[in-house]
Amino acid sequence: MDAKARILVVDDEKGMCEFLHYLLEGEGYEVEEAHSGAEALDKIHQAPFQLVLADIKMPGIDGLEMLRRIREANQDTVVIVMTGYSSLETAIKAIKYDASDYLTKPFDDPDAVLAAVERGLADRQEEAGR
């Protein structure tokens, strides 16, 4: 596990941000929060994050648009999208924009979130080694 990885949690629901912040910080990650896509993009442009965990359905710039903009900027940031409104269309868009993983909320098992984060960071490290 990359215990020093910087992770940005993006969700307009503050309770979800707090839950994920606590969960990830407890595993040794450096965690920041953003409560909108615009705020997240500002933070990403200011300092690099190894991983972004973002809700899809947010007002303004949603998670998929944010993901598209991150990829457009050629950033190798791992992006995991999450949603409480799962649909085939959103899953296809997430894959198209190269999301590392697609999680549905509410989370039945917080360990599944941690596993997705660890997989995403391991894949990123493997790609960097090529």
Enumerate the language-model features and the residues they cover.
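Two-component/phosphorelay signaling modules centered on CheY-like receiver
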Residues: 14-32
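Helix N-cap/capping motif at the beta->alpha junctions
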Residues: 33-42, 63
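Short amphipathic alpha-helix used as the core "switch/output" element in two-component signaling
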Residues: 42, 64-76, 93
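Active-site T/S-Asp motif of two-component receiver
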Residues: 54-55, 66
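Receiver (REC) domain active-site loop signature in two-component systems and cognate sites
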Residues: 58
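Receiver (REC) domain switch/output surface
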Residues: 112-124
